[in-house]
Regions:
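Accessory terminal helices/loops
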Residues: 15, 19-35, 203, 207-280
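Short, basic/low-complexity N-terminal boundary segments at the transition from targeting/disordered tails
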Residues: 22-46, 123-130
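Short, hydrophobic/aromatic-rich segments at coil-to-beta transitions
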Residues: 47-53, 145, 154-156
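Metallo-beta-lactamase
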Residues: 73, 80-81, 156-159, 165-243
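Active-site HxH/HxHxD metal-binding segment of metal-dependent hydrolases
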Residues: 81-151, 242-245
Length: 280
């Protein structure tokens, strides 16, 4: 699905350098590290000793994340067109890799083919027949609050509908970051459900980030300087609420953002939604 993603630099609310739980310094201006694999369709860079960021070249830096524990690894999202993605990640980690999705849009599921099973939230099953029509493996479900034990590293699944009905965000609380897919937009948020649902998810993640001291979220279209911060999530919550309460008037858009005809644009983020689906 074509998306109009405006890769404006996000204003990060954290300090110029932030240490992870192991004390590794990470440059907040660009968390993408050294290149460990590159071909015509994807480039993988190392974030820390056990985490890698992949960027596809088809739809505005569509991003995938390889997250490794002592016993196994998960691959979060699969890009748009990445042939033999299983063989690519096998060059990066020797651990068995399980494919998991933040949501089922075409620019996040394109490389799932070689994986024998794929995990996602059941809320996105209505779009799977279109976006994953050729997938022959098993589809399994991830539930809100589910904890994935990778061996010495745990990843928690939190339900964040809004962009799609089944969007989820993955959190590594020990490292103080998460992987949010398109739930908060990569600076250009497309709400395919409604604003009430998006506001609910933003408020929930705002509280989660405060409670667990989450520094930032790696988005689904990461360009190196557009991390999602607590402030960004709070701004999205407030902008949705203001539209719903009549305090902020949306403007008409040209419909190029996923066919959506309304938008609000402020604080470095654009929220696109459809008047046909209703705001509530």
């Amino acid at each position: 699905m074509r998306k109009s993603i405006f890769l404006a630099a996000a204003l990060l609310s954290m300090m110029p350098y932030m240490a992870d739980a192991q004390g590794t310094e990470i440059n907040s201006r660009d968390h993408r590290g050294d290149v460990v694999y590159q071909d015509d369709e994807v480039v993988f860079r190392q974030l820390d000793e056990h985490t890698w960021i992949g960027n596809g070249h088809r739809v505005y830096n569509e991003s995938l994340y390889l997250v490794e524990g002592n016993d196994r690894a998960i691959l979060i999202d699969a890009g748009t067109i990445i042939p033999e993605l299983d063989k690519i990640v096998a060059k990066i980690t020797s651990k068995p890799v399980t494919m998991m999705l933040t949501h089922a849009h075409g620019d996040h599921v394109g490389g799932v083919g070689p994986f024998p099973e794929v995990y996602l939230n059941a809320g996105d099953m209505p779009i799977v027949p279109n976006s994953m029509r050729n997938y022959q493996g098993q589809i399994k479900y991830l539930n809100d609050g589910q904890v994935i034990d990778l061996g010495g590293r745990e990843i928690e699944v939190i339900f964040t509908p809004g962009h799609t009905a089944g969007s989820i965000t993955f959190f590594d609380k020990a490292k103080h970051y998460g992987f949010s897919g398109d739930a908060f937009g990569s600076t250009n948020l497309l709400v395919f459900t409604n604003l009430s649902t998006e506001m609910y998810s933003a408020e929930r993640i705002e509280n989660y980030m405060k409670k667990h001291d989450i520094y930032y979220l790696f988005p689904g279209h990461y360009s190196g300087d557009n991390l999602e911060t607590l402030q960004r999530v709070t701004d999205i919550k407030n902008m949705c609420r203001e539209v719903l309460d009549g305090e902020r008037k949306p403007t008409a858009s040209n419909g190029n953002s996923g066919g959506m005809d309304m938008m609000v644009d402020d604080k470095g983020v654009r929220i696109n939604f459809s008047s046909r689906s209703g705001m509530k």
